[in-house]
């Protein structure tokens, strides 16, 4: 899934160390639970440098009141909502996340429940028990070779990932 575009990262995103940990919501598995927590900042997968297996958990996003500000702030033109592509049915679920732009290697990582995700940190969703075996497959050299054959550029899109063949049991 392609992730959210905030429209203005300077307003909506912070590094972890820039906010009070008391205002950060960790480990929530649903929008309702996050809303009920009263927290303002939530973990945000935004891509980042090449890293395989786990990591690049550097940012938090302002998702206070179920993202009310993000979901309702108009673009300066006044013609549309500034942020878009919220994927509300998928946020806070465990997933595999990958950086859209890469030097040459495909870096895919496991992400626990509780994260929202960015358009530069797109995510792959499946049954939670299957995520780690799928991670093993997608982080392999054969998967990288297939991805390079499908898309020889440095941009990895969700559609590229979805056509990698694997056993139905996964």
Describe the residue ranges of each PLM region.
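Polybasic, glycine- and aromatic-enriched phosphate-binding surface used to engage nucleic acids
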Residues: 1-169
């Amino acid at each position: 899934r392609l992730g959210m575009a905030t429209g203005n990262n300077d307003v909506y995103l912070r590094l972890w160390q820039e906010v009070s940990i008391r205002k950060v919501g960790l480990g929530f598995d649903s929008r309702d639970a996050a809303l009920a927590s009263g927290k303002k900042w939530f973990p945000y997968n935004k891509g980042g440098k090449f890293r395989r297996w786990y990591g690049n958990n550097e940012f938090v996003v302002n998702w206070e009141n179920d993202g009310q500000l993000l979901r309702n702030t108009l673009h300066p033109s006044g013609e549309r909502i500034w942020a878009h592509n919220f994927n509300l049915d998928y946020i806070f679920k465990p997933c595999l996340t990958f950086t859209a732009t890469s030097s040459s290697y495909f870096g895919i990582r496991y992400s626990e429940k509780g994260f929202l995700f960015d358009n530069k940190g797109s995510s792959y969703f499946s049954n939670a028990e299957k995520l780690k075996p799928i991670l093993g497959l997608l982080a392999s050299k054969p998967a990288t070779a297939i991805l390079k054959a499908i898309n020889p550029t440095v941009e990895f899109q969700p559609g590229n990932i979805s056509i990698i063949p694997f056993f139905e049991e996964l």
